Amino acid sequence: VKTDRRSALAGLAGSLTCIATGGCSELMASETAPTFIRREGIRLMSGDMPYRIAGANMWYAAWLGADAEYGNRARLGRELDRLKQLGLNNVRIMAAAEEGPLKNSISPGFSKADGSLNPELLGGLDYAIAEIAKRGMTAVVCLGNFWEWSGGFGTWLYRVTGQYMDMNDPAHPWPAYPDATAAFYGNAEAIALYREYVRAIVARTNSLTGQAYADDPAIMSWQLANEPRPGGSDAGVASHQDAYIQWIDDSAELIRSLDAHHLVSLGHEGTQGAHGSEDIIRRAHAKVDYLTAHIWPLNWGWVDGKDLAETWDAGSEKVRDYLATHERLATELNKPLVFEEFGFPRDGEVYSPGTPSTFRERYYRTIYNAVEVSRRSNGPVMGSNFWAWNGEARTAHADARFRQGDLAYMGDPPHEPQGWYGVFDNDDAMLAAIGDHANALAVE
């Protein structure tokens, strides 16, 4: 593994021109795919070597991979080539999106409003996984979402109850949305729809390669959902947490009944997504293979985006404490830990590509340092995935808002300002930080 990654970096160093044309895909198509990633105690392993993740979030990979008006396979190839050039070996992608009435949901989805599956987008997923495999990379494949931007649990509930709630609806202030969405775990009909969809994806055969997903080593992990929470209020969590744990355990069992080769993960934020409860974290990760933590200092009020200089010190201390808490929990549970989402705004909370990102760079290096320190001390942290890769995409609108019909997909989901957290291909300081860390992990 270490030789492959080092030689890939060296071999690609002089090949930047092919990125502009998408021509690197064939160059890397002959790379040997990794063995199935597995868990041994607190380690993720590939063969007899630890598998350390230097990764990115790229939720939109299947959309680019679709042979459809909204797809752009040439761009997908260029973006994956850029990530490979940086030394990254893992991407986290969405394999679920449910069409429905929620105003912030991406369209098209994998599951159409009438419940039928979208063959074009499924083909896009096939293509994305095949392209990831060509580059010797792996994917975390996410099968659902607690949040509304891809439809998610709220849409499954809507399909069986006829009722829904938009996030940030003034008529339903926080935490009404997470409490309402957590009702999913106790609704047998909604869970049945989710399970049916999970079966369709996990048991799928890639239409382009003829390989069953269950037999494809390019898939590192099936992930139950993006950031599933047990609720938002004391009462909501108390009401839903037992059904929540049961849903996790049953879903992990379902996936393993369909696929004996791949890891299963939850996609959890950590204690911030568990109403501060370490006990919920322990229970939630009992039946999955590794822990995840997501770290969002601005969203959680730990820093002020308009005054990062004055709020950085206190905020970064909370970040370090959060990382340490989850490393301790992973050690206690004897399981690996991945910091699979972390994001930070640019200086002044602006959105434009190439603009200063002094504190974002400092933040990324804080996360990366924690990964590297854990490695040196034989700890459980096996890597990270930054949120998120924007690459060559650029917004077409002065207000940086995504509009229906826009096709320049970014790591910033459509309901958020385009450029808020994502890393563009000309963010040189950020690319250097990401590449430095990938290099540090490249030799075992």
Question: Can you describe what each PLM-predicted range is?
Answer:
Residues 424-444:
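A recurrent domain-boundary module in secreted/ectodomain proteins
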Residues 1-16:
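N-terminal secretory signal peptides and thylakoid transit peptides that target proteins
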Residues 34-302, 311-336, 342-362, 366-368, ...:
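Active-site mouth of glycoside hydrolases
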Residues 207, 373, 440-444:
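A structural signal for alpha-helix termini and helix-coil/disorder junctions
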Residues 23-33:
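C-terminal segment of N-terminal export signals and the immediately downstream linker at the start
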Residues 23, 75, 429-433:
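Exposed alpha-helical structural elements
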Residues 16-22:
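Hydrophobic h-region of N-terminal signal peptides that target proteins for export
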